[in-house]
């Protein structure tokens, strides 16, 4: 019997890098509401007392960058100086330019179907049947811990919580099946006055226990709650934050490969984002169809070229049919050209700020989580 441990981490919406992601995606959403053809690459940097929003944007839309940035920061919970960051009073700097005309000529086409990829690159998508949302379990539960932290903070149930937090979940596997939680790490920013006893008890009873399956917990499970003992200074006062610095948190928690391209602040013409969503969509439909227990898709593109330069399917020995057949089915049922996948997944809509915390995958409200091709794939593969 083979046994091993696997760990994934998540961070809260108040983590500095996630503040930056949410600002960048909020800018993207506001632009897409006004200009569906906009080209957006928005980057954000946050540090004590300031937020810098920059990048390359070509659009007919007008967005009040300053007020939008302040709103995002305040919505997260940084509303007064005792938090170490205040959306009402921080400086907001704007350093936005236009997209290069050299890129435009390679992307835009008279026939939209011929739209070229906005850049070269490789993208991966992944799915596994170890959770109901067809995502790896460690990252799924790490995200849920962070969502619960935000819920009890914002509701006032644990009023001493502050926005910055991190989680980490280590699962124990035997013969590739989860048999329990080996360790949980949860570090959360808090107010000055809360005692360590109250903090430990509150986090355990209101965050950890309601989220993790009771059958996975045992007397051997290790819990590390604020292991340094104090976490008052947090958010951008503790660390600077940058868009695109949490690409593993955003995807599969290290359970699958990553092409290296970040998502937030990029419009769907950027295949770093849209093709990674499409790859997840393809992998999830293959697993939902019962064609594999685990599936990883790799796509690659050349700048200015519509068709993917490669498609790879890997099922890690769990496939019910040959990988070569799966590749041909992917080509048959999924249009993976940039314009095709944008239409297939209805990506020109203001949905991106919501993706920028708690993971881009495994959340059913997003169109790339549909399994509407699962039955077609199953029939075409000849499975009963």
From Swiss-Prot:
GO terms for biological process: one-carbon metabolic process; S-adenosylmethionine biosynthetic process. It is found in: Cytoplasm. It catalyses: L-methionine + ATP + H2O = S-adenosyl-L-methionine + phosphate + diphosphate. Its main location: cytoplasm. Gene3D superfamilies: 3.30.300.10. Keywords: ATP-binding, Cytoplasm, Magnesium, Metal-binding, Nucleotide-binding, One-carbon metabolism, Potassium, Transferase. SUPFAM superfamilies: S-adenosylmethionine synthetase. L-methionine binds at residues 56, 99, 239, 270. Pathway: Amino-acid biosynthesis; S-adenosyl-L-methionine biosynthesis; S-adenosyl-L-methionine from L-methionine: step 1/1. K(+) binds at residue 43. Its cofactor is Mg(2+); K(+). GO terms for molecular function: ATP binding; magnesium ion binding; methionine adenosyltransferase activity. Mg(2+) binds at residue 17. It is an enzyme of class 2 (transferase). Its EC number is 2.5.1.6. Binds 2 divalent ions per subunit. ATP binds at residues 15, 164-166, 230-231, 239, 245-246, 262, 266. CDD domains: S-AdoMet_synt. It comes from the Bacteria. Pfam families: S-AdoMet_synt_C, S-AdoMet_synt_M, S-AdoMet_synt_N. One of its GO terms (cellular component) is cytoplasm. Catalyzes the formation of S-adenosylmethionine (AdoMet) from methionine and ATP. The overall synthetic reaction is composed of two sequential steps, AdoMet formation and the subsequent tripolyphosphate hydrolysis which occurs prior to release of AdoMet from the enzyme. PANTHER family: S-ADENOSYLMETHIONINE SYNTHETASE. Belongs to the AdoMet synthase family. Homotetramer; dimer of dimers. This is S-adenosylmethionine synthase. It comes from Haemophilus influenzae (strain PittEE). The lineage of its organism: Bacteria, Pseudomonadati, Pseudomonadota, Gammaproteobacteria, Pasteurellales.
């Amino acid at each position: 019997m083979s046994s091993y441990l696997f760990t994934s981490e998540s961070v809260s919406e108040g983590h500095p890098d996630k503040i930056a992601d949410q600002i960048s995606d909020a800018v993207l959403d506001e632009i897409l509401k006004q200009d569906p053809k906009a080209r957006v690459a928005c980057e954000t940097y946050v540090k004590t007392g300031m937020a810098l929003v920059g990048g390359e944007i070509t659009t007919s839309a007008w967005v009040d960058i300053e007020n939008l940035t302040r709103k995002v920061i305040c919505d997260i919970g940084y509303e007064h100086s005792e938090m170490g960051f205040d959306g009402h009073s921080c400086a907001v700097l704007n350093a936005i330019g236009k997209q290069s005309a050299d890129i435009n000529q390679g992307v835009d086409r008279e026939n939209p179907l011929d739209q070229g990829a906005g850049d070269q690159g490789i993208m991966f998508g992944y799915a596994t049947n170890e959770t109901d949302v067809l995502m790896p379990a460690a990252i799924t539960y790490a995200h849920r811990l962070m969502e619960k932290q935000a819920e009890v903070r914002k509701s006032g149930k644990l009023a001493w919580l502050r926005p910055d937090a991190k989680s980490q979940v280590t699962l124990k596997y035997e013969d590739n099946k989860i048999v329990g939680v080996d360790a949980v790490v949860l570090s959360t920013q808090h107010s000055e006055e809360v005692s360590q006893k109250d903090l430990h008890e509150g986090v355990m009873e209101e965050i950890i226990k309601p989220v993790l399956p009771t059958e996975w917990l045992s007397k051997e499970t290790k819990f590390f709650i604020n292991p340094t003992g104090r976490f008052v200074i947090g958010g951008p006062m503790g660390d600077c934050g940058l868009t695109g610095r949490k690409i593993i948190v955003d995807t599969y928690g290290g359970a699958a490969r990553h092409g290296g391209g970040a998502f937030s602040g990029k419009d769907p013409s950027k295949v770093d984002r849209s093709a990674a969503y499409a790859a997840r969509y393809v992998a999830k439909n293959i697993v939902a169809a019962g064609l594999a227990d685990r599936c990883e898709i790799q796509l690659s593109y050349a700048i200015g070229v519509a068709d993917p330069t490669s498609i790879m399917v890997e099922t890690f020995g769990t496939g019910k049919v040959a990988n070569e057949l799966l590749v041909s089915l992917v080509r048959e049922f999924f249009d993976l050209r940039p314009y095709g996948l944008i239409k297939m997944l209805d990506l020109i809509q203001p949905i991106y700020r919501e993706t920028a915390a708690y993971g881009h995958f495994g959340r059913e409200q997003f169109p790339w989580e549909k399994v509407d091709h699962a039955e077609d794939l199953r029939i075409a593969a000849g499975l009963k």
